[in-house]
Design a protein with these regions (language model features):
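Phosphate/pyrophosphate-binding betaalpha-module
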Residues: 135-159
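Short, positively charged patches
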Residues: 1-140
Length: 159
């Protein structure tokens, strides 16, 4: 759980893009090492510029602790890139997410067909109904339904 806090810290850190975070993970063995690295050491990697090194100097773990508490309260799990359950197919894309959030059981993504349902946050009642029905019918047939879990179409598809 302690190591997870540093993954969430890194993923939630504003102003530092995901590609930079991924390059840093190539140089350091863990987000915890990135957390404790001084700005000078971060700069030596060539992965960050001075502004990004300054942003990475924000050592507040409050946001990470809040995310972990909210996930625990909601019964959600977090999968990091170094977790064995992180999908290999996802790890191989150009810009993979550092973390995956989920609820329920963690499916084996590499063995199942997956369908993503994404849409607008500002949707019509008809759109909500269609997304909800679509997500339900797909899941009923055994499909793995994925979404970004944003309010609107994404959330409706996951009900």
């Amino acid at each position: 759980m302690a190591a997870l806090k540093y993954w969430v810290w890194l993923a939630a850190l504003p102003g530092v893009g995901s590609r930079v975070k991924l390059r840093l993970l190539e140089h350091f063995s863990s987000p915890e090492e990135i957390y404790y690295a001084p700005p000078e050491e971060l700069l030596l990697t060539g992965a960050v510029d001075k502004l990004q090194a300054k942003l990475l100097a924000d050592k507040s773990l409050t946001r990470a602790e809040d995310v972990l508490a909210a996930c625990a309260k909601a019964g959600q799990f977090i999968v990091t890139m170094d977790d064995t359950t992180y999908p290999a197919r996802l790890r191989d894309i150009f810009d993979p997410p550092l973390l995956l959030y989920g609820k329920g059981s963690m499916p084996i993504f590499d063995d199942e067909a997956a369908i993503a349902v994404v849409g607008t946050r500002k949707c019509t009642a008809y759109g909500l109904d269609v997304a909800s029905q679509l997500g339900y019918e797909l899941a009923k047939q055994g499909a793995l339904v994925l979404s970004g879990m944003a309010k609107g179409i994404d959330t409706a598809a996951m009900k």
